[in-house]
């Protein structure tokens, strides 16, 4: 049965020393932070699909607005899955997880991640993204370090970051972000992620701490909270609401289907050279306005003529709003290194990925309705309706 822990509130038993049914050997144990969020939950689904009962996953998540246990409903009864409700800034809670479990791998997703929210409330981004990462690093170091300063064999910490730390690229199709590109963050969010990246780099350099960093482009796919562009446009179009576009709509982003990202993270864990950074990009660069047109066209293709929503989904819904402060013009990742060293490449082209994403939201309208109620609606009104 599932173990579910609420540190600081209710403490239930946690299964320890789980054995692999196939050969009796100890399962490799993954500690996944932020696993109830968009990318984290997709990663957990991917890992269980690939490894089934060969691994054990402990998912720690504070369940803030974007964390949702509904994302993991189909894995919650697995004996090799444990959920822990805790904040990564809580040193005692995180230390307890390491003390009570032989953690082999840490996959650190947990972060505040929405640029607009960081502009409105930067302090929480510094606290979670910088302090929280420091707590995770310290607890992992304390658990894994051997006398003399070396580390236990087979341990690895993977810090999941963003291409936004690199700043903005010019409107030049030949300009890309590489692992050697200097950091130049322009928002409180990207500055907080750049700071957390630097902490991980410092631990690798100072302590020879076993870690990797991945910097990914914009993700899309199932379970994404609708403050982000693609689910926002899908949801608004289906409800006949305006489709807000910042500025002139010509900002460019590189889009990566979330399952491709999950695969990349697994491959870096298994094959990546320690202490290295790997850029993970989708080679799907598109202007924001182009994304909106593609979503409108795809909805028109997928909805039957009998669906009354089809009639009002058109370009008339597009509404240009005041541009975001410090809005970076273009992001584009060159994933050459991860392809050459590990053999990873993005498998999902955008047309296929957006079709799968829209199909998922069609099949999970209750999920969308649940997450767009309450506080989200208040936030949405402040961000878009009042502009």
Report each predicted region and the residues it spans.
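A glycine/serine/threonine-rich, flexible loop-to-helix segment
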Residues: 75, 173, 226-234
């Amino acid at each position: 049965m599932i173990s579910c822990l609420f540190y600081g509130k209710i403490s239930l038993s946690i299964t320890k020393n789980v054995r692999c049914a196939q050969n009796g050997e100890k399962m490799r144990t993954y500690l996944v932070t932020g696993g109830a969020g968009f990318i984290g939950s997709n990663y957990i689904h991917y890992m269980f699909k690939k490894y089934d009962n060969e691994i054990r996953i402990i998912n720690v998540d504070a369940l803030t607005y974007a964390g949702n246990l509904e994302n993991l409903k189909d894995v919650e009864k697995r004996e090799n899955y444990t959920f822990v409700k805790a904040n990564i800034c809580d040193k005692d809670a995180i230390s307890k997880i390491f003390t009570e479990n032989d953690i082999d791998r840490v996959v650190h997703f947990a972060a505040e991640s929405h640029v607009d929210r960081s502009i409105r409330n930067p302090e929480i981004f510094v606290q979670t993204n910088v302090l929280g990462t420091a707590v995770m690093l310290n607890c992992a170091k304390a658990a894994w370090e051997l006398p003399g300063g070396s580390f236990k064999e087979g341990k690895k910490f993977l810090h999941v970051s963003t291409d936004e730390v690199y700043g903005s690229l010019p409107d030049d199709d030949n300009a890309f972000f590489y692992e050697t590109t200097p950091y130049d963050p322009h928002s409180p969010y990207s500055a907080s992620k750049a700071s957390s990246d630097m902490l991980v780099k410092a631990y690798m350099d100072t302590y020879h701490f076993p870690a990797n960093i991945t910097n990914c482009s914009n993700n899309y796919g199932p379970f994404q909270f609708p403050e982000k562009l693609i689910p926002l446009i899908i949801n608004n179009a289906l409800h006949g609401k305006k489709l807000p576009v910042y500025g002139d709509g010509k900002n460019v982003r590189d889009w990566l289907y979330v399952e491709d990202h999950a695969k990349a993270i697994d491959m870096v864990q298994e094959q990546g050279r320690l202490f290295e950074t790997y850029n993970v990009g989708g080679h799907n660069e598109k202007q924001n306005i182009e994304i909106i047109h593609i979503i409108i066209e795809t909805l028109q293709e997928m909805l039957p003529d009998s669906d009354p929503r089809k009639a009002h989904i058109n370009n008339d819904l597009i509404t240009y709003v005041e541009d975001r402060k410090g809005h970076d013009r273009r992001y584009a990742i060159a994933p050459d290194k991860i392809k050459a060293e590990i053999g990873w490449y993005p498998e999902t082209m955008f047309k296929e990925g957006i079709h799968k994403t829209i199909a998922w939201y069609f099949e999970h309208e209750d999920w969308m309705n649940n997450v767009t109620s309450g506080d989200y609606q208040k936030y949405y009104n402040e961000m878009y309706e009042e502009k």
